[in-house]
């Protein structure tokens, strides 16, 4: 076997542990590749799998989560935590509003949620609340599709007045993956005994099959690595375009900064005609300019800050070709 030829692994075993958990075995892998691929797939599975989650709820008679409701054993914080445990699957849509209405005495579960034809609850036995004889629970919940984790604070309006009273915002974990572990054992091919065997065990919440989750994670990894496969062709193109990739703001004359006449004339006296010329100067260099004092320097720094620029920056390929010729025409 040639040194340059890598072994191509194959799936040798898919062991179904239960409806939500599966163990996948892949071999043979070159030495070290077991941990490389195992860690990459594990991270993608835990952080990048799309899923659905309840992100908002409204409960009749409840204005905020730090309260209780007569006839309901749990406080509102507990109910919101229980709602986060509902495994919802949307078919053909990215958002839906669902309702739940129950009267006690009863144990309210996810199976009591009123579903539409394209919405599925995977764990209908999941407990949401316990109602006594006088208890009643009417709530509306918003379910959306997303990826990763999103804290409630990210979705609360900055202005408190914009937040509707009674809207309870939940932290949302969209990932359908409950647990991922991997281990690397030794594998053998003919006389080679230094190879890896990768064993991945994955458990989901039931909204996606474990083997399907592994396929999606591998596809995501493959898509991300495609950019490196195409790297050679991009390098030459980048070199050709490098000279032209100059921020148009830097090509604007310093007159566009609307400086005082004194400051503008001082800069032009030092052959500083464009914003690109100016930002490459340091404060020390500008203070050496005749008739340009600290007040003018402060003015210059302020107008540059408004444009996201500052003094002392370094630019490649400056000045661009033809700029000085244009400058000569303007000043002639």
UniProtKB/Swiss-Prot annotation:
InterPro entries: DNA-dir_RNA_pol_insert (IPR011262), DNA-dir_RNA_pol_RpoA/D/Rpb3 (IPR011263), DNA-dir_RpoA (IPR011773), RBP11-like (IPR036603), RNAP_asu_C (IPR011260), RNApol_insert_sf (IPR036643). SMART domains: RPOLD. CDD domains: RNAP_alpha_NTD (cd06928). It holds the Pfam family RNA_pol_A_CTD. Residues 246-332 are annotated as: Alpha C-terminal domain (alpha-CTD). The keyword tRNA-binding does not apply. Gene3D superfamilies: 5' to 3' exonuclease, C-terminal subdomain, DNA-directed RNA polymerase, insert domain, RNA polymerase, RBP11-like subunit. Belongs to the RNA polymerase alpha chain family. Homodimer. The RNAP catalytic core consists of 2 alpha, 1 beta, 1 beta' and 1 omega subunit. When a sigma factor is associated with the core the holoenzyme is formed, which can initiate transcription. DNA-dependent RNA polymerase catalyzes the transcription of DNA into RNA using the four ribonucleoside triphosphates as substrates. This is DNA-directed RNA polymerase subunit alpha. It comes from Nitrosococcus oceani (strain ATCC 19707 / BCRC 17464 / JCM 30415 / NCIMB 11848 / C-107).
